[in-house]
Structure formats: structure tokens, C-alpha cells
Amino acid sequence: MGSPIEIARSYPEIGRAKVSMSPLRTLLLAILAGMFIALAGVGATFGNVYGNKIVGAAVFPAGLAMVIIAGSELFTGNCLLIIPALEKAITVRQMLRNWALVYAGNLIGAVLIAAMTVGGGTFDGVYDTVIATAAAKAALPLPAALLRGILCNILVCLAVWMAMAAKNVTGKIAGLYFPIFLFVLCGFEHCVANMFYLPAGIFAAARCGVSAENLTVYTMCIGNLLPVTLGNIIGGCAVGLVYRTVYLREK
């Protein structure tokens, strides 16, 4: 099992590896991550409908497990690239370029799953839940969306950090499970998950002929994804800054 200082020391090399990948490879891996998180969102939706919020929260960690174990690029986890950037292993420009490409890929993957599941009738009988979930997210006040985004990515980056401490699949799943369970249970906001939930709500409303005035591309992007993404960046970078200060900064 890797210690926290060993994980911190590994991040400069991890950062170099991530930014050295070709744009196509990065984009494809990011699309996969968006799909994995979206599929977890599908499962969590049914967990909420047929069980309760705890069941939905218990299912959702499958998304990050697929991201880490199968291998893909997730925007929220890549906020930890602040560590190699501060260590000058990569440039800020390289970090921002990675974030932009991964964000775009995550969006493509998540929207693809939203379109396929709604179009394929996966949510038959539970469209009201899909629409209500999206509408609630779109109606969040901007400060609430920002703060929930910060709290969410503190937990997500801790989940990534804890998974890196393990050397086997079982340990990685155990490490990431509880932080992800907590963020879903607490109702915090994850931009990549919302790239699924919000389009799914829009598609479901259109499929059912339901009028949902606050479910538009504008409210999705400006009302939710923008503040949640900013919050996720702040929360993720805060985790990276603390661990970099504690373990890598020269005394």
C-alpha cells in the first residue's frame, strides 16, 4: 500500500504522462470516462426509484471504479494536475489544455449515454424521476451549485488519492468507494455526472411531451455546469494544494 507521501511524489510523473498523450488518445479516454460516470448515473437513478437515496449512493461508485481500473480520463480527477503544475513537471498551459480536452470528451461520452438510454427506453416508467432530477439541478441557485461543486470534488479527489494507495483491484475499489458514496448521499454536484443527468432530463421531457421550462441548454450550461465546474476545480485544486504543501514543498 502506498503512503500519502509516495502518492504525492508520483504525481509529477503522472502529470507528465497525461499531458504527453496525443489529443486523440486523451479525447477517446475522456469519452470513455464520461460514459462510465453516466452509466453509474443510470444505475443510481434506478437505485433511487426502486430503493432509496442510500441505494443510489451505493451504486454510483461503480463509475469511478470503472474510470480508475479500466483506465480513462476524468476531468474532476485531473484537477489534481495542479500538483505537477506547481512542481513544474508540466506547464500551466499543458494542464489547462488537458482539462479542456478531457472536459469535452467527458461531455461527449455522458451525452451519448443520455441519448442512448432515453432513446432506447431504458427509463420507461421512471421518466418523471429523470425529469425531476434534472429540473432540481437546473434550479439550484448559483452559490449553492458552486459550493456543492467544491465539496463534491474534495471527496472525488480524495477517492482518487485513496485508490492510488492500493496495489490491487479490491483495494482500489475499497479506497474510492466511501468518498464517492458520501458525495452522492450528501447531494453534492459533480459536473461530469450532471453532463448525463441534465441532458437525460431534457431528452426525457421531449420524449414524453412534457413542458419543462427550466430544462434548456442554457440553464444546463450556465445555470448548472458553469458554477459546478468552477466549484469542482476549486475543490480538486484545494486537495492538490494541501497535499503538495504537506509532502512536496521544501521546508
Task: Give residue ranges: language-model regions.
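Alpha-helical transmembrane segments and their helix-helix packing motifs
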Residues: 1-251
